[in-house]
From Swiss-Prot:
Keywords: ATP-binding, Ligase, Nucleotide-binding, Protein biosynthesis. InterPro entries: Amidase, Amidase_CS, Amidase_dom, AS_sf, GatA. The keyword Protein biosynthesis applies. This is Glutamyl-tRNA(Gln) amidotransferase subunit A. It comes from Ehrlichia ruminantium (strain Gardel). Its EC number is 6.3.5.7. Allows the formation of correctly charged Gln-tRNA(Gln) through the transamidation of misacylated Glu-tRNA(Gln) in organisms which lack glutaminyl-tRNA synthetase. The reaction takes place in the presence of glutamine and ATP through an activated gamma-phospho-Glu-tRNA(Gln). The keyword tRNA-binding does not apply. The active site is at residues 79, 158, 182. PANTHER family: GLUTAMYL-TRNA(GLN) AMIDOTRANSFERASE SUBUNIT A (PTHR11895:SF151), TRANSAMIDASE (PTHR11895). The gene is gatA. It is an enzyme of class 6 (ligase). GO terms for molecular function: ATP binding; glutaminyl-tRNA synthase (glutamine-hydrolyzing) activity.
Length: 487
């Protein structure tokens, strides 16, 4: 048998059914791996909670087989942005370092109710703001991959702990969040599958807010089939979330047929950057390889234009920063957050927020407050919302002539941990993922191969609203050609 940790979720499920090993044995193997990990992926470990859940899973596997699901006894990790009952939830910020929720977020509850075993909470960029997982009060996360010259690289962000844990075989799958690419970009950097569903497909109840009109739960796994299995239980309408979509959730696994003959795949010219920037050539070559794979399977390739793409990144950072400045205003040390006491209330606010919020979070709060200020609201925030509609309309028009859109996920491979990127360069890591987020569309990142530095490169498939099954199927076709690059 393969190393128990390196099995896919589907393979783990099959072996649990066959009694090749128990859920407790599977869970203990992961606990041992976590205790010895050097990636700094897990920040809160819950071994007793996990073993109790595994014992319950073993009981179901033996005595209540009608209750078995695809995730019964499967060990998973949870990004520390999702509330977990009686388990610390910090968003990796000092201001919430001691916060323990009294309830589970909806998506966590649905995972646990479906039989998944929670191993603990995963590191992330503070309040999900970042592309490298270096903005965490618990320290940076290390990518399991290293460059060919031995240099350590970042896992991406903000779900860097989730992507590193899955790629490093510390858990079978992980829950992440995606606001502008925070599931897809780290998945690309770590060579795994990362899926962001349609906005509203998964409940945001109990998920610590960054930008409420963009935030969406997502999954990170090692295979496309696993992504379908993990996504299934967390979808569905929730009365606790006013943005939750009240529509039926299909069985995603049924959509993975590997049949794409006649499907029209859009290739947006605006995503081709290698003509201007030589450093993006490797990604463009892999993009062409992915196009060829889909052509081989009978798909029709269609050149399309998304003319407002160039505005997406600045629009995104205005909108998400504005929403963050509003959402994070609650952390003042009185109702929420670790308080720094002072005799003067204004000084207390200043010390509490100044000492307990990180540099990137404060930067975005300031950007957002500026964009929302009375003198600049129309010039920045209102205009950004108007352009967001134009970006969305580009996709709506394109989906009248194509079924899916294929792009790179990130412009380059993962960068070195000790590489000091300026803020703008860091933001550019999300240049390909942000447009789909602004439009609220589902998108998946799938590994396509390795760079010359032996680091993962990935492609992104964007689908029409609520067509998660379709993007899973396209990703599965690419996976058929590339295999599992983690091997």
């Amino acid at each position: 048998m393969k190393d128990i940790l390196k099995l896919s979720i589907a393979e783990m499920h099959e072996n649990l059914i066959k009694k090749e090993f128990s859920a407790v044995e599977l869970t203990q193997a992961h606990i041992d791996a976590i205790n010895n990990e050097q990636l700094n992926a897990f920040i809160t470990k819950t071994p007793e909670v996990a073993l109790n859940a595994a014992r319950k899973a073993d009981h179901i596997l033996t005595h209540e087989q009608d209750k078995i699901t695809s995730l019964t006894g499967i060990p998973v990790g949870i990004k520390d942005l999702f509330c977990t009952k009686n388990i610390k939830t910090t968003a990796c910020s000092n201001i919430l370092r001691n916060f323990t929720p009294q309830y589970d977020s909806t998506v966590v509850k649905r995972l646990i109710d479906d039989g998944a075993v929670m191993l603990g909470k995963l590191n992330m960029d503070e309040f999900a703001m970042g592309s490298s997982n270096s903005n965490s009060c618990f320290g940076p996360v290390e990518n399991p991959w290293t460059r060919a010259d031995g240099v350590k690289v970042v896992p991406g962000g903000s779900s860097g702990g989730s992507s590193a844990a899955v790629a490093g075989f510390l858990c079978a799958g992980a829950l992440g969040s995606d606001t502008g690419g925070s599931v897809r970009q780290p998945a690309a950097f770590c060579g795994i599958v990362g899926l962001k569903p349609t906005y509203g497909r998964c409940s945001r109840s109990g998920m610590i807010a960054f930008a409420s009109s963009l935030d969406q739960a997502g999954v990170l796994t090692r295979t496309v089939k696993d992504a379908a299995l993990m996504l299934q239980p967390i979808c569905g309408y929730d009365t606790q979330d006013s943005t939750s979509a009240n529509i039926t959730t299909p069985r995603f696994l049924d959509s993975i047929t590997n049949i794409i003959k006649g499907k029209r795949i859009g290739i947006p010219k605006e995503y081709e950057l290698s003509n201007k920037y030589k450093e993006y050539e490797e990604v463009s070559e892999m993009w062409l390889k992915g196009i060829k794979y889909l052509e081989n399977e009978g798909a029709e390739i269609v050149n399309i234009s998304l003319p407002h793409t160039s505005y997406a990144l600045p629009v995104y950072y205005i909108i998400c920063s504005a929403e963050a400045s509003s959402n994070l205003a609650r952390y003042d040390g009185i109702k929420y957050g670790t308080r720094v006491n002072s005799d003067n209330i204004n000084e207390m606010y200043e010390l509490t927020r100044g000492n307990n919020l990180g540099t990137e979070v404060k930067r975005r709060i300031l950007i957002g407050a500026y964009a929302l200020s009375s003198g600049y609201y129309d010039a920045y925030y209102n205009k950004a919302q108007c352009i967001r509609r134009l970006v969305t309309n580009d996709f709506v028009e394109s989906f009248k002539s194509v079924d899916y859109i294929l792009t790179p996920t990130a412009p380059k491979e993962a960068f070195a941990m000790d590489e000091q990127l300026d803020t703008l360069t860091m933001y550019l890591n999300d240049v390909f993922t942000v447009p789909a987020s602004l439009a609220g569309l589902p998108a998946i990142s799938i590994p396509i191969g390795l760079s010359k530095n032996k680091l993962p490169l990935s492609l992104q498939i964007i689908g029409n609203y609520y067509d998660e099954g379709g993007i899973l199927n396209i990703a599965s076709v690419i996976e058929k050609y590339t295999g599992n690059i983690l091997k």
